[in-house]
Amino acid sequence: FNCLYLNPIFTAAEYHRYDLLDYYHVCPNLGTDDDFRELVSEVHNRGMHIIIDGVFNHSSWYFFAFDDVVKNGENSRYKDWFYGLKFPVKRPEDGESPSYTCFAYERKMPKLNTSNPEVRDYFMDVCRYWLEDFDVDGWRLDVANEVDKDFWRAFRSVAKKTKKDSVLIAEIWENSERWLQGDMFDSTMNYEFRKVCRDFFAFGKINAREFNSRFVDMLLRYPFPIVQGQLNLLDSHDVSRFRSLCAQNSADSGDSSAVDKRFRLAELCLLTSVGTPSVFYGDELGVVGFEECDYRAAMPWANPVKDNRDLFRELIKLRKSNDCFIHGNFRVLDYDERGKFVFARED
């Protein structure tokens, strides 16, 4: 099925909304709760699904529980909701060391104690609420490897009981085998796919022989049904745009047509490989950028940098034309030292 995956939609303090204030309401900058219900309904009417981003490893330092800790110190009923508290807890100025554990050393994102039963119960209700009241179809789960495993087992149980066909996709950057044993997640974001494609298509730093070796190793890492469900990607909100990486190849010497060719070949690989392809917004309109403020820029509806919509339409049509692209086996046919790599998808 086709699915929209949305970055955090909840009320937050920062523009990226990975520091959540309120897990029960849509951020007013995006619209209202009813607007979101309407979006979900329209998505479903088109035969599509929609999943949302769950950030349960950390919160905003203005999240109600942390705010209570700041105000009431050791008397706060929420003092066990967070890691590494040293009283008195305050919100430090830029450059000051926080008196609590943070995510990625970001003082505005205190780390939640997901092994705490109260914390667990709170977020189990959040899970249930969006699946039940808004009819979303699943969750993409942020920084999943830093969250307590029993938390995820409970989360899966609640999600599947609430909506049996809900999908749980975890953000795991490395080997995900221990997370894909059937007790936590259905899939993980396959950043290894991006790394291999980056080195071959964009940078040209490996030849077809090494690409074959790394690509096949990636496919053999998990049982085939799990490989089929891996979320393959070239771009996301956490990495520089793939098209920008293609432009870094010194062999092209600023040749835009060569850059476009590298990008198109990588997208061809993405849409025809084993796994579930994920296309990041803006790739179809040529969005570029190395820095966060650029690769997360607004969609250039009126002035596309490079209009690739026909490319994506063609590749998506190709993928849908034959079930072998979804369920079929993967077989390498040929490769050579000049960069040729040929594979087949077959029933």
List where the protein language model places each region:
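Substrate-binding/active-site clefts of carbohydrate-active enzymes
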Residues: 2, 9-133, 155, 161, ...
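Short, solvent-exposed turn/loop segments enriched in Gly/Ser/Thr/Pro and often Arg
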Residues: 2-14, 54-63, 142-148, 171-176, ...
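Hydrophobic faces of well-ordered beta-strands that scaffold small-molecule active sites
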Residues: 4-6, 50-52, 139, 168-170, ...
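Conserved, mostly hydrophobic/aromatic
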Residues: 6, 23, 43, 53, ...
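The substrate-binding groove and active-site-proximal loops of carbohydrate-active enzymes
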Residues: 18-33, 105-121, 137-146, 194-208, ...
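Active-site-proximal helices and loops of the catalytic beta/alpha 8
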Residues: 40-44, 58, 70, 132, ...
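Substrate-binding cleft of secreted/luminal carbohydrate-active enzymes
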Residues: 267-288
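Carbohydrate-binding surface patches
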Residues: 333-347
